[in-house]
Amino acid sequence: MGLRSTTLVLAATSSLLGGLIFGYELGIISGALLMLKTVFQLTCFEQEALVSAVLFGALLASLIGGFIIDRSGRRTSIMGSNLVVLAGSIILIATSSFWWLVVGRVTVGFAISISSMACCIYVSEIVRPHQRGTLVSLYETGITVGILISYAMNYFLSAVNDGWKYMFGLAIIPAAFQFIVILFLPSKPHTLNFWEQDSDNGFIELEEAGESGEFKPDTYDKQYTFLDLFRSKDNMRTRTLLGLGLVLFQQFTGQPNVLYYASTIFRSVGFQSNSSAVLASVGLGVVKVASTLIAICFADKAGRRILLLAGCIVMTIAISGIGIVSFMVELDSHRDCGSIRSKNTSYGDSNASQLLGIIHAGTPTINTKDNLAHQLAMVIQSPSLSNSAGSKHTASMFPNSTVPPAGPDSNYAILNWITLLSMMAFVSAFSIGFGPMTWLVLSEIYPADIRGRAFAFCNSFNWAANLLITLTFLEVIGSIGLGWTFLLYGGVGLLAIAFIYFFIPETKGQSLEEIDQQLSSKRISKRRETSKGVRKRPSTGPPYQRVGKSNWT
C-alpha cells in the first residue's frame, strides 16, 4: 500500500472514529441516566440538566470553536478534542457529585462539537473531489454506529455495579484511537494541482507544513474576517444564508422529536417484551446505518442536491403520514421524568424502554440532533399504561387524547403498522439526505480562510434550533395536537424542498477552489458545473490557470 493509499485509509478511519465518539456520547446517557437517577436521587430538573449539559457544551463550542479551528488548525483541533473527551470522561468516572457530572457532560459536549466540525472540514480538504462525499459522509456513519454501540453497552452494563462509570469511560477508547490515527496525517493539506482529474490516481499532493504555514495556492490567498459572512464580498452573505437554511430546515422538519414516539409505536404494534423492544430499537438503528451507507455510495455519484431532495421528499411524506394516522389512532403522549423507573417495572424493563427513546444521531449529529433534553431525561411512562393514575395524568395534560391499551387493538393494527413504517422511512430518508449531506455541503461552500468560523456559526444555529424544537414540543402538542404538529413539520418539509431545489448548488466532482469560484458569482447556479473543464464565465479578474507540479519544482 502506497503512501497516498495509507493516508486515504487513515483519513477515512479518523472520520469514522470521530462520528463514533459523537454518536456514543449522545446515546450512552440514556442507559447511564437510569442508574444515576437512583445513585444520586436526581430530581426531574437535575435529570434535564444532566442530559441537556451536552447540548449546552456543544452550543458553546459552536460559538467559539470556529476561531479555534481556523487559528489552531484542523488537525490540532481534532487532537485537542480527543484530550478534552479524555478529561471529561475522567471527571464523569471519578465524580461523586451531581454538579461534577454536569461539568463532565458539558466538557464532553464541547469536545464532540469541536471534533465534528474539524473532522468534516479536515477530511473535505485532504481528499480528492471524487472521494470527498464518501469520506465526509463516513462521519455520519460513525455517528449511527456509535449510537448502536451505546445501545449495546446500555443493555449489557445495566446490571453491573457502577455500570454508568464503565459506560462513560468506554468513550476513551475511540478517542485514543483517533488521537493516534491523526498523528500520521498531514498537519495542513495544500493542493499543488487543484485536484485536476488527470493528476496522479488516488490522493492529492500534500505539503507537510506547520500549522501556521503561509504557503497557499492563488485561490487560497484571500483573507476574511468573521463579519465578512454578512457582507457581499465574494457572495459570502448568500453562502451564509445557504448554510443557515440547511441547518434550520434540518431541525424544523421535526427530526429531533419524531422518534420520541418510537416506544409508543413499538408497543402499539406488539413489541412489548424486554427483548423484542430492545430488538426493535436496535433494528431501527440498523436501518439508519444501512441508509447512511447508501448515502455514502451515492454522494459522489448522484450528487448532494439529488440526495437532499430525495431525502426531504420522503421525510415530508412520512411525517405527514404519521400526522394523518395520529388523527385516527390516538398515541399516548405522556411522559413523566419521575417514572423512569417504576416500582412495578424491573430495571431491565426500564432500560429497554429507555433505549427506545434515542434512535437518531445528526449530527455532527451530528444528530447531532437528538431530542436530548426531553427524549432522554423525561422518558415515556412505564409499560403499565393502563393504570388509573397514569390515565388521569395523561387526560389532564392532553384532554382530547386517550390512553391506548397496553396491547394493539385489532381495529388499529394496520394504522399502527403504517405509522411504524412511516417512522422507519423518516429515519432512512434523514440518513440519506439531511443527515450526511448538510455537513458535507457546509464543508464545501466556504473559502478556506473562514471555513471553520462559518461552519461553527451555522452549527451554533443547529444546536440552538435543536434546543428550541425540543423544549417547545410538548407546548406545541398541547396547543394544536399531535396530528397537527406532525403536519406542521410536513409543511416545513415542503418549504425545505423548495429551498433545496431553487438555491442549493451541486458541488459533486468539483475541487474546493472550483466551488469557491462558482459561489463567488452573484448568481448561484443550482446545476452542476462539471469538473472536466468548469464552464467558463466572463471574468474581470485574472484568468484561471491550471497549476501543475512542474510549476512548483
Swiss-Prot record:
This is Solute carrier family 2, facilitated glucose transporter member 10. It comes from Xenopus laevis (African clawed frog). It holds the Pfam family Sugar_tr. InterPro entries: MFS_dom, MFS_sugar_transport-like, MFS_Sugar_Transporter, MFS_trans_sf, Sugar/inositol_transpt, Sugar_transporter_CS. Keywords: Cytoplasm, Glycoprotein, Membrane, Sugar transport, Transmembrane, Transmembrane helix, Transport. Glycans are attached at N274, N344, N351, N400. Residues 1-15, 70-82, 127-132, 187-240, 299-305, 435-462, 505-553 are cytoplasmic. It comes from the Eukaryota. Residues 37-48, 104-105, 154-165, 262-277, 327-413, 483 are extracellular. D-glucose binds at Q250, Q251, W439. Belongs to the major facilitator superfamily. Sugar transporter (TC 2.A.1.1) family. Glucose transporter subfamily.
